[in-house]
Amino acid sequence: MRGDDRHNGGYCAPPARLPVPALTAILELRKVRKQYGDTVVVNDLDLQVHRGQCFGLLGPNGAGKTTTLRLLLGLTTPAGGSLTLCGEPIPERAPQARMRVGVVPQFDNLDPDFSVIENLRIFGRYFGLSSAVIERRVPALLEFARLENRANAQVRDLSGGMRRRLTVARALINDPDLLIMDEPTTGLDPQARHLIWERLKSLMASGKTILLTTHFMEEAERLCNYLCVIDGGRKIAEGKPHDLIDSQIGCDVVEVYGDELDTLRGSLTPLAERTEMSGETLFCYVREPAPLLAALHGQSGVRYLHRPANLEDVFLKLTGREMRD
């Protein structure tokens, strides 16, 4: 939606809303701690999300991402530290803060007994919006979700990608200061995923602030302009995606597949900054790839892929390659 849609009937701001100052953090956690029994799940966590950012919160399973989201929404109480959301202290004024937030949960919770347009209307009432305001916003949201021609369709008849787009549109019904998205494209095929990315980029272009959790590193690299990686409830790295790639990896990657990789690794190690075995793949990190590629050329029973380093390399370096439950 364009900014002028707020005044031409597409997207009308709630009259009682107080603006969040542009130069302050829209979300801030300071030394936040949460534990269940003896298990610490969020450990002195500091975060700041500023207006206009697409902020990625990354971490393996069990890192504390879901608990962090619950804490910032006031759905669970911290054991220590302080939180503010949209200028409100959390959890003391969590209900007021949540009125200025849109949430896209990991799993769709649309009402299957209602149509697309009815899902939008009902959700608008949860925020106390008048029927007039809701009716002004719905057409723009249907257009945003590319569901103009499915407004009266039942949710049960929509594809997975359509349901996900409707969930995002529904989270925008209150014109939120912050949009929180938990694994927004999990379970979608590539075409549906790319369409969601396109819609999110249009939100970012309009200045919307987004907090995103995802296990798709390509998604984080494409969408986010700032990232925080957590593990064990602690922040272990933060920065812009390409800055993290440069500082943590800083070179090209050659993936090698084939026979007798342990033997081959010995001859390739002197040609690389470092090497790493993971399953049936040898990873070689190289600043000058030509000598290593020359050594691989003509090797029988060996395949290889030379590529730039990416955010997945960073994530695996920081959190390890072991499977997490």
UniProtKB/Swiss-Prot annotation:
Q: What is its EC number?
A: 7.6.2.-
Provide the protein name: Nod factor export ATP-binding protein I
Q: Where in the cell is it found?
A: Cell inner membrane
Complex formation: The complex is composed of two ATP-binding proteins (NodI) and two transmembrane proteins (NodJ).
Report the protein's function.
Part of the ABC transporter complex NodIJ involved in the export of the nodulation factors (Nod factors), the bacterial signal molecules that induce symbiosis and subsequent nodulation induction. Nod factors are LCO (lipo-chitin oligosaccharide), a modified beta-1,4-linked N-acetylglucosamine oligosaccharide. This subunit is responsible for energy coupling to the transport system.
EC class of the enzyme, as a word:
translocase
What family classification does the UniProt entry report for this protein?
Answer: Belongs to the ABC transporter superfamily. Lipooligosaccharide exporter (TC 3.A.1.102) family.
Membrane topology of this protein: Peripheral membrane protein
Q: Where does ATP bind?
A: 59-66
| UniProt domain ABC transporter: residue ranges | 27-257
> Does the record bear ATP-binding in its keywords?
yes
InterPro entries with a match to the protein in the record: AAA+_ATPase (IPR003593), ABC_transporter-like_ATP-bd (IPR003439), ABC_transporter-like_CS (IPR017871), ABC_transporter_ATP-binding (IPR050763), ABC_transptNodI (IPR005978), P-loop_NTPase (IPR027417)
Which CDD domains does the entry mention?
Answer: ABC_subfamily_A
Record key words, sorted: ATP-binding, Cell inner membrane, Cell membrane, Membrane, Nodulation, Nucleotide-binding, Translocase, Transport
One GO molecular-function entry? ATP hydrolysis activity
Kindly indicate whether the keyword Metal-binding belongs to this entry. no
